[in-house]
Regions:
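Intrinsically disordered, low-complexity segments enriched in polar/charged small residues
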Residues: 14-15, 25, 54, 412
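C-terminal segment of classical bacterial N-terminal signal peptides
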Residues: 20-30
Length: 513
């Protein structure tokens, strides 16, 4: 561990400087964000962030933990070969956690950095990823292998601590990777979500690593768990029922990290979470020509994507500022992006295109929407009981959703008792029609975000409603929580770490339309 001193913290407002000899980043202009949120991200898919998840669930010993996940590299068609979708060793993937006053300031207190390395067992073959049927993680048949290391950066004291390292399982090609699929048969579709760790496929089980410091990690390909009819939304809001899941059948790459709450100072608090990716650019140069950087020629890293709450950059920020969002930190959100949350154009479009000019949604002075998105960190109350989880749907024969889980979160009656102040949507029980004396927060987004939260419908209901006065909440849900006609993920979800479902099989794809 190396310490840089008190000046490190002050420098954070300019750049989240890297630790352990790494070079500063984020002070250089950058390019993009999320599934397809900003124009320039289409040129850099492996650095493109898709979704951030943060929720409270217990670890293997029953202790509450903060589960974090970052999805990248969207729109992976499983049927395309050779399968070249991989993490990028020239990209730093980072999940940031803000504590205390850092939440309102929009700056990270801690950063968890994932860095990858790629190797081949043999390059004297055209078989890039698979030399045969892969029986176990990193066996002789897995030609392309990736490993990763995780570093925790603490901006309070300028330290970097090695958390651990792991190996990435193979992508799901089909016959080369049979154990991902039903009946361990490469001709069958990928396994749907499961309820226990022993039911996970072999490759996923082998790739989950638990470190002596209490962290648990996974990095690898998964089914894209985001669901929504994005095509119809951007086709002049011509919503349809049933809708078509725009991410149905596609894979992505996921990094999951389970963080002990002792690492964050306990559970009597709210924390903020967001993520960034940064790409290695030209090697750094010393102005003197004799500096240390010239000797080691470390690359500079440029932030190319940022992701916090779902849909913000895609659904609220104007085109002229989308790339600005990608290259900035949440520290500037109040100055640059507050206007988009307080005066959401999407609400205006709902009134125009769906309401025919009638005011269905309030489109000015939305302090309630700004409380969610500004600064753009997912705020999560750690004081609650563990969240309820999505499985394979309500009433599914195997691995059904938890009792009380609602994809609509608070709008579906899914709430959790809050035992500590701090969350912007912490409501007194009497405001929810319950006996006075307690406080509650949403069971899912915008209190954290779970796999299975229907963020499209939640966002639309929030825009149609008036949440500005907690004592007089006005919930407007004319379509009963079904706006884009998509209510779940075709593969379901696991109810155990790493939670996102098995990657789709290239030979037998489920849900692609």
């Amino acid at each position: 561990m190396k310490t840089f001193g008190s000046t490190y913290r002050r420098a954070l407002t300019i750049a989240m400087a890297a630790i352990m000899g790494f070079t500063p980043m984020l002070s250089i202009p950058a390019f993009a964000s999320s599934h397809m949120d900003a124009p320039l991200i289409t040129r850099d898919p492996s650095a493109n962030t898709t979704d951030v998840y943060a929720f409270v669930r217990p670890d293997a010993n029953g202790n509450k933990a903060l589960n974090l996940a970052l999805g990248v590299y969207p729109h992976q068609n499983p049927g395309i070969g050779p399968n070249k979708y991989n993490f990028d060793e020239n990209v730093r993937y980072e999940i940031h956690v803000a504590l205390g006053g850092d939440i309102a300031a929009g700056r990270p207190t801690l950063t968890y950095r994932f860095e990858f390395n790629t190797a081949f067992k043999s390059q004297k073959t055209l078989l890039q990823s698979y030399l045969g049927v892969i029986q176990n993680l990193d066996d002789a048949a897995q030609n392309l292998t990736q490993t990763y290391r995780i570093t925790k950066i603490d901006y309070r004291n300028g330290t970097g601590t090695f958390i651990g390292q792991g190996a990435v399982p193979p992508n799901n090609q089909g016959n080369a990777t049979p154990f991902y699929n039903e009946g361990d048969n490469g001709e069958n579709p990928a396994r749907k979500g499961v309820a226990t760790a022993t039911e996970l496929d072999k490759y996923t089980r082998q790739a989950i690593v638990t470190f002596p410091n209490g962290y648990t990690a996974f990095a690898g390909q998964r089914d894209d768990g985001f669901f929504g009819d994005i095509q119809s939304i951007f086709d002049l809001l011509k919503l349809r029922n049933p809708g078509k899941d725009s991410q149905g059948g596609y894979n992505l790459h996921l990094m999951s990290l389970r963080v002990p709450l002792s690492e964050l100072g306990g559970d009597q608090q709210t924390v903020g979470v967001f993520a960034t990716t940064s790409r290695a650019m030209a090697p750094a140069q010393s102005t003197s020509g004799r500096g240390f950087l010239d000797l080691i020629r470390r690359p500079q890293f440029v932030q190319v994507a940022r992701q916090g709450n779902p849909l913000f950059n895609e659904g609220l920020v104007a085109i002229e500022d989308k790339d600005t969002y990608s290259r900035t930190l949440p520290t500037t959100d109040g100055q640059i992006f507050r206007k988009y949350a307080e005066n959401p154009e999407l609400a205006t479009l709902i009134n125009l295109l769906i309401g025919g000019g009638q005011q269905l949604a309030i489109d000015k002075g939305r302090a309630d929407i700004a409380a969610i998105f500004i600064p753009d960190l997912i705020k999560i109350d750690l004081s609650t009981d563990p969240v309820r989880l999505a499985g394979n749907g309500p009433g599914a024969a195997t691995n059904p959703d938890d009792m009380g889980f609602s994809r609509l979160s608070i709008f579906g009656g899914d709430i959790l008792e809050s035992r500590a102040a701090g969350h912007p949507f912490r409501l007194p029980s009497q405001f929810l029609g319950l006996p006075a004396g307690k406080f509650f927060v949403p069971g899912g987004w915008p209190n954290g975000r779970r796999f299975g939260d229907d963020v499209v419908d939640i966002a639309i209901i929030a825009l149609l409603s008036d949440l500005r006065n907690p004592a007089a909440l006005k919930i407007n849900d004319p379509f009963m929580g079904n706006y884009d006609g998509v209510t779940g993920n075709e593969m379901g979800f696991n109810k155990v770490f790493p939670y996102e479902s098995t990657p789709q099989n290239g030979r037998n794809i489920v849900g692609m339309k």
